[in-house]
Amino acid sequence: KEDVINYIEENDKLPEFTVKSPTGEELHSDDLSGNTTLLVFFVTTCGDCKRELPKIDSVWNEMKDHPTFRLVTISRGKTTEVVNAFWKEQNFTMPFYLDPNEKVFSLFANSTIPRVYLVNRENIVTWMAVEQMSLSAKQLIGKIEQIM
């Protein structure tokens, strides 16, 4: 098994990337400046993702109306149809973006998901979790609010 390499760590600036929503709307990493962003990479078939994503959806439901909060949930390597079906099955309301060729993911790491990054207004990663978050949705909201 190859060693996990984190290309982006705490205190690093977000790399430049662009992702598309299922409707084709582009989001560029520069668009996140000035906001507090929770960035999440997942795959619909990953057990750890299935455990962590409901927490992320809870955070979204609690924080979505905050004007400077952004949630960028990125599906690694799956089609819109696959993610839509998974979202429906899980009753998620949070938005998602697609990384069909894993190009964006490869800027952050070579393997291991889910990955959760908390990013401040200057687009600097202030906290990250790989595989397991070990935080409840409420604790994660606390972390987000601390840096807003």
Segments (PLM) and residue ranges:
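Short pre-active-site segment immediately N-terminal to redox-active cysteine/selenocysteine motifs
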Residues: N35-T37, F42-T45, T112
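Thiol-based oxidoreductase modules, predominantly thioredoxin-like and allied folds used
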Residues: P67-T80, F92-E102
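N-proximal helix/coil linker or "cap" segments that precede and/or mark the start of modular domains
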Residues: K1-E16, S33
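Thiol-/selenol-based redox modules, centered on thioredoxin-like
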Residues: L118-M148
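Conserved redox-active cysteine motifs that mediate thiol-disulfide chemistry
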Residues: F41-S58
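Hydrophobic beta-strand anchors of alpha/beta hydrolase catalytic cores
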Residues: L38-L39, L71, V116
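A short beta-strand-turn-helix
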Residues: F17-T37
